[in-house]
From Swiss-Prot:
InterPro entries: Acetyl_CoA_COase_a_su, ClpP/crotonase-like_dom_sf, COA_CT_C. The lineage of its organism: Bacteria, Pseudomonadati, Pseudomonadota, Gammaproteobacteria, Enterobacterales. Its EC number is 2.1.3.15. One of its GO terms (molecular function) is acetyl-CoA carboxylase activity. Acetyl-CoA carboxylase is a heterohexamer composed of biotin carboxyl carrier protein (AccB), biotin carboxylase (AccC) and two subunits each of ACCase subunit alpha (AccA) and ACCase subunit beta (AccD). Pathway: Lipid metabolism; malonyl-CoA biosynthesis; malonyl-CoA from acetyl-CoA: step 1/1. It comes from the Bacteria. This is Acetyl-coenzyme A carboxylase carboxyl transferase subunit alpha. It catalyses: N(6)-carboxybiotinyl-L-lysyl-[protein] + acetyl-CoA = N(6)-biotinyl-L-lysyl-[protein] + malonyl-CoA. Belongs to the AccA family.
Length: 319
């Protein structure tokens, strides 16, 4: 896979281009008198070291860019790498099937679970079909239908959060966007099964929170979680989206800061260069965390689980 490099990664991109060029020359002419292998290896080591240096000092705005990276793994990618026997379920049984939300029954190391997550899409047609990962009310009602099914059959619920926010269109508002989100918040707080939520990319406002009320809330290292996008915040406070980097720093949208505030439980480390650089490794780390969380929650009685979730919600805002 050819990598897309962000602006702050351009020094890495230049090194990778040199590596690709030398590798291509070496393959095209095996009769070259000079050995390029040592030079290629030297450049690769230099690229790794440079990547470590750049990623060791990322700001909140750079993390926000990584959270939106077009090659970042989405919900369906993690389903493919982590779960088996996935059977997708569709529709809210009231209006339509919103493709911005995917969900269904699968097995996690043999254990039946219900998976629900946002899905953005890769190519233009798929992005449009999935509305860029911005669900309408029917998407959240589909999610709730699947959660209630999981509750009836005593299956743990695993959600993957990755959305700029709930869709703000006129049609969505007419069909009750705010009601759908609010109902999910209420109902998720009373479900009798373990709920594990993970922010895998963008965690945008109520659109993220609508499938984010859980017993465990995790974030990938280079994901974000906020009430508004940095650009939106900058447009309100400074009347200019150009101030987005400043807004990102002020808002505290990155995983380590949110863990300090006790809004999330775990920051899951990503491979060097972010999740899209090594999806299998990222999926393995995420799977290990999900299994650990399930093990922690499965031993709780229904009453203890609900009391713990209630206390978690009541403690928000207290550091």
């Amino acid at each position: 896979m050819s990598l897309n490099f962000l602006d702050f990664e351009q020094p890495i991109a230049e090194l990778e281009a040199k590596i690709d060029s030398l590798t291509a020359v070496s393959r095209q002419d095996e009769k070259l008198d000079i050995n390029l292998d040592e030079e290629v290896q030297r450049l690769r080591e230099k690229s790794v070291e440079l990547t470590r240096k750049i990623f060791a000092d990322l700001g909140a705005w750079q993390v926000a860019q990584l959270a939106r990276h077009p090659q970042r793994p989405y919900t369906l990618d993690y389903i493919k790498h982590i779960f088996t026997d996935f059977d997708e379920l569709a529709g809210d049984r009231a209006y339509a099937d919103d493709k911005a939300i995917v969900g269904g029954i699968a097995r996690l190391d043999g254990r039946p679970v219900m998976i629900i997550g946002h899905q953005k899409g890769r190519e233009t047609k798929e992005k449009i079909r999935r509305n860029f990962g911005m669900p309408a009310p029917e998407g959240y009602r589909k999610a709730l239908r699947l959660m209630e099914m999981a509750d009836r059959f005593r299956m743990p619920i695993i959600t993957f959060i990755d959305t700029p926010g709930a869709y703000p269109g006129v049609g969505a508002e007419e069909r009750g966007q705010s009601e759908a989100i609010a109902r999910n918040l209420r109902e998720m707080s009373t479900l009798r099964v373990p709920i594990i939520c993970t922010v895998i990319g963008e965690g945008g406002s109520g659109g993220a929170l609508a499938i984010g009320v859980g017993d465990k809330v995790n974030m990938l290292q280079y994901s974000t979680y906020s009430v508004i996008s940095p650009e939106g915040c900058a447009s309100i406070l400074w009347k200019s989206a150009d101030k987005a980097p400043l807004a990102a720093e002020a808002m505290g949208i990155i995983a380590p800061r949110l863990k300090e505030l006790k809004l999330i439980d775990t920051v899951i480390p990503e491979p060097l260069g972010s999740a899209h650089r090594n999806v299998p490794v990222m999926a393995a780390s995420l799977k290990a965390q999900l299994l650990a969380d399930l093990l922690d929650l499965e031993g709780l009685s229904e009453e203890a689980l609900l009391n713990r979730r209630y206390q978690r919600l009541m403690n928000y805002g207290y550091c």
